[in-house]
Amino acid sequence: MKRRRLFFSVLLSILTLFINGPLITTAQSPPSSSTSCNRICGGIEIPFPFGIGRRDCFLNDWYEVVCNSTTSGKSLAPFLYKINRELVSITLRSSIDSSYGVVHIKSPVTSSGCSQRPVKPLPLNLTGKGSPFFITDSNRLVSVGCDNRALITDIESQITGCESSCDGDKSRLDKICGGYTCCQAKIPADRPQVIGVDLESSGGNTTQGGNCKVAFLTNETYSPANVTEPEQFYTNGFTVIELGWYFDTSDSRLTNPVGCVNLTETGIYTSAPSCVCEYGNFSGFGYSNCYCNQIGYRGNPYLPGGCIDIDECEEGKGLSSCGELTCVNVPGSWRCELNGVGKIKPLFPGLVLGFPLLFLVLGIWGLIKFVKKRRKIIRKRMFFKRNGGLLLKQQLTTRGGNVQSSKIFSSKELEKATDNFNMNRVLGQGGQGTVYKGMLVDGRIVAVKRSKVLDEDKVEEFINEVGVLSQINHRNIVKLMGCCLETEVPILVYEHIPNGDLFKRLHHDSDDYTMTWDVRLRISVEIAGALAYLHSAASTPVYHRDVKTTNILLDEKYRAKVSDFGTSRSINVDQTHLTTLVAGTFGYLDPEYFQTSQFTDKSDVYSFGVVLVELITGEKPFSVMRPEENRGLVSHFNEAMKQNRVLDIVDSRIKEGCTLEQVLAVAKLARRCLSLKGKKRPNMREVSVELERIRSSPEDLELHIEEEDEEECAMEINMDDSWSVDMTAPASLFDLSPKLDVEPLVPQRTW
């Protein structure tokens, strides 16, 4: 047995020598960015690119750390200079499994009723040229106390919050802050850079309530079992939140990163076996993150030579695998050598270097190939099940979807169609994933929607979109061509719509402007027809729940295509409404739905009314350029209707070529759609018929126009009045050009 073990050890040694070849075994020590730089403050290590003191101790101002006294004055603590927040820890990216470095900082607690005056800290602002920081999605909003309503503010167009109370069923104690004495909500997944916390009582009054209540952001997990009284959080004064950080490659200083040279945008590359850098894209900016190769190196990749070779022989890893052979360290690895050349001669002299070695190598190669193939099959089955494949089959069968019209694509087909998901083929990016342009083997152009890393909570949302689209067949609705469930993240394949979205065409000036009044009126007729089909003509009635101009795509002939069913819901024929979490977009959200959480077909009608107003005025749903009381487009339009000056707000680009009677007729129809009470609004079938009549019979309009009661004036959800959201970083929906994206902006409110 002993000789057999030695035999296999010899074969392993020869194979290792063959693969590795002669390698240099010396290791290098990394030079510091500056030998005199202080790397410790308050017991916390400050690794480069962060630093304290002189400018050569840190990369740039965003990475500067100031070592100051704490508020008590008894000790020193590190502070990030640019954002003036106390540091708790800094972590470099350690492996390919993480996509960025991590910084933990202290965040103040928002409170009310705990002292004579409420405490509302300033929002955390990470914006600025070259800012490497963003708020990771591992953080949560947590609120503790009775009758609380906590909101995350400064998130552009989204609503996120939660409520807690001390009344009701105490069985909710078993949940993780499920609403009894404490609650929590996820922050948006699109990495916001400005974020704050607002706190009020459930009655809406931020100054009353009497009892102490607190709210804060944190990456720690809380449950009723470990949540203390709100006074304790108020006394502590702060919690810990997590920030991600990366290198901005637009900085000229980082054209050649300090640790890895010759950065390119082709994905992963290595400047040496010890250091690996990875390129990515965030909010339109390129960035990189580097880490020491996990196999045989550790250290700081942002210093020249900072990744140091690990001596596996000294640490025991190599010794345990070499057995009776000698472990020899080599850069990034180790190898096993014979103690003496003479020992090999008495042991199978003609076999050691002959055919057995060849057969052994071939056998190992065949075994590895078989195992890899088997693992690949198992992984595909696992991904299919985890991505909701069984649920999708059940839904298609239950709903009577046309299975033949939706193809199940293989991952190889989609990799070939998108050139292995090349970044140059990206059509748009959103909160839920990335859309690529692809070409199938039969020449068809498609849009491939690749979701982000799978969240088990979103499996049902993904399957819902597939189930809804598989049963829809309408010329003005984006067609689902198929899906792929055998990859780690689910993938949807749609028909490609070449001319982008309606929002971009309405609000971006261009020399080849084609959005005349006739085109706009035709588009409104097509959208209304598509929504009417969803509400009443589809095999199962469907509420879209996120009707807006960014979800209306235009084909090569500028025909409207309704897209994005990520928040849609199918209903039974005898149902009149759905009770759901509030989901939608500021400026388009039905006030009645917002107040009752009951979504009806009239809620889609309201959102379509906002789209009609956009088509008439050419203005955005929300704009800080308008007076404060009319920043919302609905309020602005309603005021003009009251004062009989609708023609003053008609888009100047279409005034000369439009029929004013048609514009007035559409404006009055929009006003009916924007009625405060849903029962006063027409249904989508009536809206579609009326728009068809306006378009085809412009000479006979006044006979069919009904005046609305003044008390039924439209209202809207106003970001400033209803939620106290400070617009510090406006979204493209309001002030800036939007990204070309078929993803829904889905603000969510968790109660």
UniProtKB/Swiss-Prot annotation:
PROSITE patterns: PROTEIN_KINASE_DOM, PROTEIN_KINASE_ST. Residues 369-751 are cytoplasmic. The modification Phosphothreonine is found at residues 580, 585. Glycans are attached at residues 68, 125, 205, 219, 226, 262, 281. One of its GO terms (molecular function) is ATP binding. It is an enzyme of class 2 (transferase). This is Wall-associated receptor kinase-like 22.
